[in-house]
Curated annotation (Swiss-Prot):
GO cellular component, one term: DNA-directed RNA polymerase complex
Matching Pfam families: RNA_pol_Rpb1_1, RNA_pol_Rpb1_2, RNA_pol_Rpb1_3, RNA_pol_Rpb1_4, RNA_pol_Rpb1_5
Subunit: The RNAP catalytic core consists of 2 alpha, 1 beta, 1 beta' and 1 omega subunit. When a sigma factor is associated with the core the holoenzyme is formed, which can initiate transcription.
The protein's name in its UniProt record: DNA-directed RNA polymerase subunit beta'
Organism: Bacillus cereus (strain ATCC 14579 / DSM 31 / CCUG 7414 / JCM 2152 / NBRC 15305 / NCIMB 9373 / NCTC 2599 / NRRL B-3711)
EC number of the protein: 2.7.7.6
Catalytic activity: RNA(n) + a ribonucleoside 5'-triphosphate = RNA(n+1) + diphosphate
Family classification: Belongs to the RNA polymerase beta' chain family.
Length: 1203
């Protein structure tokens, strides 16, 4: 066999009859499979041992030769070679067909490749191949044309008139003769001439034909090989026959299909030998053709061949197609050994990098390691006795297991794995019971909860795999989320509540204004009940262990609370003492107002001050991000563990709980509802008098009730006590929000009906008061829709992720700097006056393309090619600079990937991106993972056009698939001024007056205008409200405008839903959609007009002819949707495993395509290491040196000081 790592590329082509015979180990002559009595394979049958190899290792059919010592002997009695049984997985056979048969892929595919080569219509081909018409193969000196179709009647008439001066035939033989007669060079030259003059349909047909003929000419495939003389038979182990319990046999459908072919083939041979009448022979040939069609692709033509119970049989094509096909089931998604799964429970006492592994599971997973260790320690004599010891679970096994799993990380995975944080590595600790223990902080990344979720465990075996798991995948390393660079391990729920409660302040609490010499004294006072956690006290600043205090501050007293003293102990020493939830306190130092002179009247000062807000979830997240920025991973993960412990401890101590009495019904509610009802009655009156339309009435009613609900919500939030448990839960960010309270204590408000239209009867009751029957019924609509939508959304979002991954999977950081001189001009993204994404957010972690200067002073803020850090970005934004020219993936020149400079910082680590990082996959995951959080459809607020523009997930799909948007905007094709807006019949027309010409645009019915007469407009800008069709925009403007538009639109959808995604991820995806051009004129190059080419291939072809001083080709950029872009990729393996498998393979075979194995999928499919990360060639040459125990100890001390 070929070694996986030794081949450079993979090529696919058409097989010639001789090639098929050379693969074969013998001809299959009989349709029999196995003998029903002996259960041994029949000779010359579909499972014949002589052809395919022995069924048992080292044993021939008749049993004359048994044992390894006869290796390679061919038995003289039964003719079976003595060898391993696994050759039955690779040895092929063949069937010599009595008549040529056409291959359905090439005859039936769209477009029909055979039809294009012969310049015949698929209808005509079908008539010939299935013996309905004759085709003239040689016209001789008759008035007939070559390739002319004749019916049976006409054929007889011409035969009688002209005798044998012409030749006509039917069936695949006739087609084969025509294919052999074709002179490719002559045809190609003829077509190239025709292209110079042809227009319209003739031109497109010529381009298609030229493409196929060129493919045959360049690939060395013969057109006549599309007709089969010999049929290959795949190895028997790939179409197995197994005995079931009841003695019956289950067999692969392929055996049935092969059997039909062999039966018909043998019958045809016999008929030909007997010299049967031609009509019988023709019928048999047609049946053979149909049998071969069914074998190759059952159901492609006519009704599929069915098995028992009318189930269509699965043919060779079905074996490759779809989720259950060879590609996606076995090559891209393999099942692995050394894995297990179990329910997860919370492990609050674990460290960040640990997980609890059930003992029996660990023993099974680490069995080989334990066996080896038992033998090495002398506790067992050999592997066999070690295995027995483990199976009997003897006590010494547990000690060995302990030592084996130490330092051996395991991977935990939770399905669905939406982004790379769905698989992380942990150090296992053995636990009793049968459940896996999971650290509470990693739940967010896994999106896990403990209501019965299950997780899978995998063991990395090789030392390289263990090293990668430890250094790259350890949970303590994955603190930032790759999609936005924010911490993903923020505390949630109980932990948030505990820290919130701990940092509360309360006016007039017990012991207010006491002064302590240090934190310990304050704690002592708290434990003895002299002060409360929330009491505002003073502590000598010198005793608080904090390096950010100045000398002057150290001589003063620090005003704080007991809880904040406890909270600040978890932070590193050189971090500011956090006394208030503000950014300045976090980033710079504790504000000066919290320091007072010793001897001042503390009680008075405290009493005169407002309470400081406690720390909510958002603030905790900011603290984590800031600690990470300053102290890197180890310190952060330690601080996180401490924060978790504090949270759990104090949420327990707080005893915060919810009771019915916490929900207080608003007193003024009735009054507000009365007012609203009166307004509604008024609107209805106006409607009845005909003053307003039905639509206006509906809209006004809806807005009146919405406003009433908002008023109630505002009053309710004001009336809630700051100590109300429910308020605390919501305010801290632990659970719940304002709208939940309004429903509990105010009113439920308006509901939508199943179609998404809002019902104008509001639900006036709250849950506290209870709903009436009608109200309950109305609210069930919305609830049911919510559940149904969620289910649909998950599937949609998963499919979107799959397409995104597919289109970007070969984008890898390939080099340090591509040396481009282009950049992307960026500013804040705005929608009206609202800033959707600020300039700061867009700048952080990017490289400047041009020097940025201060607009007033002219001082250099950022040099060319300098990384823009958070601090620099703040300075730039505050200086009043509107736009900055940065390096971007859009303008990167690197082939098959991006360079470090154009990509910028790796969001997951906060450092420069490494060469070899698979940024395409990361981008796809970052865009796909939040997909489930996006809403499904818009709520229709009545039938107002313009409001119904698609939002949420459907809009994202619309953008990435480059579909025509719903509610499409009309755009201007020229720069100019709006000259006039005219009313024509029932619609409007906008006239744009340019410098040279005027253009008139018809505005579709119901669209809203965005422009007024006399207003200047530039090309590519909208005249009406709505979404622009990016394809239109590309025609009118250039690539840059389209890239920016797509980026802006994607960001709009996500930011509106409160999801942050780094620009660079969207840039990587959009770049993949715009990497092709369509050749409009070939010039003197080798490229064909009308073909899609990669931009790089196109520039290469042009560079070649320009050097010879010839005419270059011209092309237009093309925007492809992600599905189309995936199928147009250079790698046929990647495309075939994505969608439309048969079409992709048909095409690739004719072109004789080479797959250079550049992307990730192609390499996974053939079983190579992926060419990203450490699998890249530049890293593969590294030698691994085993470190000694001393080195290991030093390293471990660095990684975990706390072990």
């Amino acid at each position: 066999m070929i070694d996986v790592n030794n081949f450079e590329y993979m090529k696919i082509g058409l097989a010639s009859p001789d090639k098929i015979r050379s693969w074969s180990y013998g001809e299959v002559k009989k349709p029999e499979t196995i003998n029903y009595r002996t259960l041994k394979p029949e000779k010359d049958g579909l499972f014949c041992e002589r052809i395919f190899g022995p069924q048992k290792d080292w044993e021939c059919h008749c049993g004359k030769y048994k044992r390894v010592r006869y290796k390679g002997v061919v038995c003289d009695r039964c003719g079976v070679e003595v060898t391993r049984a696994k050759v039955r997985r690779e040895r092929m056979g063949h069937i010599e067909l009595a008549a040529p048969v056409s291959h359905i892929w090439y005859f039936k595919g769209i477009p029909s490749r055979m039809g294009l080569v012969l310049d015949m219509s698929p209808r005509a081909l079908e008539e010939v191949i299935y013996f309905a018409s004759y085709v003239v193969t040689e016209s001789g000196d008759t008035p007939l044309d070559k390739k002319q179709l004749l019916s049976e009647k006409e054929y007889r008439a011409y035969r009688d008139r002209y005798g044998s001066t012409f030749q006509a035939a039917m069936g695949a033989e006739a087609i084969k003769k025509l294919l052999q007669d074709i002179d490719l060079d002559k045809e190609v030259d003829f077509l190239k001439e025709e292209l110079k003059t042809a227009q319209g349909q003739r031109r497109t047909r010529a381009i298609k034909r030229l493409e196929v003929l060129e493919a045959f000419r360049n690939s060395g495939n013969e057109p006549s090989w599309m007709i089969l003389d010999v049929l290959p038979v795949i190895p028997p182990e790939l179409r197995p026959m197994v005995q079931l319990d009841g003695g019956r046999f289950a067999t692969s459908d392929l055996n049935d299909l092969y059997r039909r072919v062999i039966n018909r083939n043998n019958r045809l041979k016999r008929l030909l030998d007997l010299g049967a009448p031609s009509i019988i022979v023709q019928n048999e040939k047609r049946m053979l053709q149909e049998a071969v069609d069914a074998l190759i692709d059952n159901g492609r033509r006519g009704r599929p061949v069915t098995g028992p119970g009318n189930r269509p049989l699965k043919s060779l094509s079905h074996m490759l197609k779809g989720k259950q096909g060879r590609f996606r089931q076995n090559l891209l998604g393999k099942r692995v050994d050394y894995s297990g799964r179990s329910v997860i429970v919370v492990g609050p006492n674990l460290k960040m990098y640990q997980c609890g592994l059930p003992k029996e599971m660990a023993l099974e997973l680490f069995k080989p390691f334990v066996m080896k260790e038992l033998v090495e320690k002398g506790l067992a004599h050999n592997i066999k006795s070690a295995k027995r010891k483990i199976e009997r679970v003897q006590p010494e096994v547990w000690d060995v297991l302990e030592s084996v799993i130490k330092e051996h990380p395991v991977l935990l995975n939770r399905a669905p794995t939406l982004h790379r944080l769905g698989i992380q590595a942990f150090e296992p600790t053995l636990v009793e019971g049968r459940a896996i223990r999971l650290h509470p902080l990693v739940c967010t990344a896994y999106n896990a909860d403990f209501d019965g979720d299950q997780m899978a465990v995998h063991v990395p075996l090789s030392s390289e795999a263990q090293a990668e798991a430890r250094l790259l995948m350890l949970a303590a390393q994955n603190i930032l989320n790759p999609k936005d660079g924010k911490p993903v391990v923020t505390p949630s729920q109980d932990m948030v509540l505990g820290n919130y409660y701990l940092t509360l302040e309360r006016e007039g609490a017990i012991g207010e204004g006491m002064v302590f010499k240090d934190a310990n004294e304050a704690l002592l006072a708290y434990q003895n009940g002299y002060v409360h956690l929330h009491t505002r006290v003073a502590v000598a600043a010198s005793a608080v262990n904090n390096a950010t205090f100045t000398e002057e501050q150290k001589s003063m007293l620090l005003l704080t609370t007991v809880g904040k003293l406890i909270f600040n102990e978890i932070l590193p020493e050189s971090f500011p003492y956090i006394n208030e939830p503000t950014n300045s306190n976090l980033e710079k130092e504790t504000p000066a107002k919290y320091f007072v002179e010793k001897g001042a009247n503390i009680k008075e000062i405290i009493a005169s001050r407002e309470e400081v807000a406690p720390f909510s979830k958002k603030i905790l997240g900011n603290i984590i991000a800031e600690v990470f920025k300053r102290f890197q991973i180890t310190e952060t993960s330690r601080m996180l563990d401490r924060m978790k412990n504090l949270g759990f401890k104090y949420s327990t101590k707080a005893g915060i709980t919810v009771g019915v009495s916490d929900i207080l019904v608003l007193g003024e509610k009735d009054e507000i509802l009365h007012e609203a009802q009166a307004k509604v009655d008024n609107v209805i009156k106006q409607f009845r008098r005909g003053l307003i339309t039905e639509e206006e009435r509906y809209d006004r009613v809806i807005s009146i009730w919405s406003n009433a609900k908002d008023v109630i919500q505002g009053k309710l939030m004001k009336s809630l006590n700051k100590r109300n448990p429910i308020f605390m839960m919501s305010d801290s960010g632990a659970r719940g929000n304002a709208s939940n309270f309004t429903q509990l204590a105010g009113m439920r408000g308006l509901m939508a009906n199943p179609s998404g239209r809002i019902i104008e009867l509001p639900i006036k009751s709250s849950f506290r008061e209870g709903l009436t029957v009608l109200e309950y019924f109305i609210s069930t609509h919305g609830a049911r829709k919510g559940l149904a939508d969620t289910a649909l959304k998950t599937a949609d979002s998963g499919y979107l992720t799959r397409r995104l991954v597919d289109v970007a999977q070969d984008v890898i950081v390939r080099e340090d700097d591509c040396g481009t001189d282009r950049g992307l001009l960026i500013g804040a993204i705005k929608e009206g006056n609202e800033v959707i994404e600020s300039l700061y957010d867009r700048l952080v972690g990017r490289f400047a393309r041009k020097t940025v200067k201060h607009p007033e002073t002219g001082e250099v803020l950022v040099a060319e090619n300098q990384l823009i850090t958070e601090d620099i970005a703040h300075i730039v934004e505050n200086s009043g600079v509107e736009t900055v020219n940065i390096r971007s993936a859009f303008t990167c020149n690197t082939r098959h990937g991006v360079c470090k400079k154009c990509y910028g910082r790796n969001l997951a680590t906060g450092t420069d991106v490494e060469v070899g990082e698979a940024v395409g996959i990361i981008a796809a995951q970052s865009i796909g993972e939040p997909g489930t959080q996006l809403t499904m459809r818009t709520f229709h607020t009545g039938g107002v056009a313009g409001d119904d523009i698609t939002q949420g997930l459907p809009r994202i799909q619309e953008i990435f698939e480059a579909r025509n948007p719903k509610g499409q905007a009309v755009i201007s094709e020229i720069d100019g001024v709006i000259a006039a807006i005219n009313d024509v019949k029932d619609r409007q027309e906008v006239v744009v007056q340019g410098e040279v010409e005027a253009r008139t645009y018809a505005i579709p019915y119901g669209a809203r205008l965005k422009v007024t007469p006399g207003q200047p407009i530039s090309h590519g800008k909208e005249l009406t409200e709505g979404s622009i069709d990016p394809k239109e925009l590309l025609k009118v403007t250039d690539i840059t405008a389209v890239q920016e538009y797509l980026l802006r639109e994607v960001q709009k959808v996500y930011r509106m839903q409160g999801v942050e995604i780094g620009d660079k991820h969207v840039e990587v995806m959009v770049r993949q959609m715009l990497r092709k051009v369509r050749v409009s004129d070939a010039g003197e190059t080798d490229v064909l007009p009308g073909t899609l080419l990669d931009i790089h291939q196109f520039t290469d072809a042009n560079a070649k002819v320009l050097l010879q001083g010839k005419q270059p080709a011209t092309a237009r950029p093309v925007l492809l949707g992600i599905t189309k872009a995936s199928l147009e990729t250079d790698s046929f393996l990647s495309a075939a495993s994505f969608q439309e498998t048969t079409r992709v393979l048909t095409d690739a075979a004719i072109k004789g395509k080479r797959d250079e194995l550049l992307g990730l999928k192609e390499n996974v499919i053939i079983g190579k290491l992926v060419p990203a990360g450490t699998g890249m060639n530049r890293y593969r040459k590294v030698d691994l040196v085993k470190t000694t125990q001393d080195d290991m100890n030093v390293e471990n001390d660095e990684v975990y000081v706390e072990q």
